[in-house]
Amino acid sequence: MRTDKINYYLDIAETVLERGTCLRRNYGAIIVKNDAIISTGYVGAPRGRQNCIDMGVCVRETLKVPRGERYELCRSVHAEQNAIINAAREDMIGAAMFLVGKDAKTGAYVENACACSLCKRMIINAGIIRLIIRNNKTHYTEINVADWVSNDESVSGVMGY
């Protein structure tokens, strides 16, 4: 049976996450416009810096920082950010981003995954209009990015995931 397009792109994002170097959670992101892949990104330290997986230590894990908090302590650049950084803005306007996250230890899909507040702002400014996030192998959530603009979480004080 032929895979539908959304799961096809989510499968590719899931393959991209296998390059991730985080000891906690790995994400893969791809940006697609007009059925062409514009860019990919995965979690990893900035170019030239040592990755957590190579160092064998995660500062946020050592400090027991909960998910969605204190990202300034993290060495990594998020998958969404790397996908945006590696693309030209004019190619991203009107595009969709596909995102898959897995626990680095168990390989289980990240429950209730969503872009963090910084990634949301970058996605908005990149001109991406849809975010599709895999919940499990067959189910996904589709987010209209315009909803993030009209429901500004920074005004309500709700941040993080």
Regions found by a protein language model. Name each.
Residues 15, 33-36, 85-88:
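Short glycine/serine- and small hydrophobic-enriched flexible loop segments
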Residues 1-2, 15, 32-33, 66-69:
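General secondary-structure propensity
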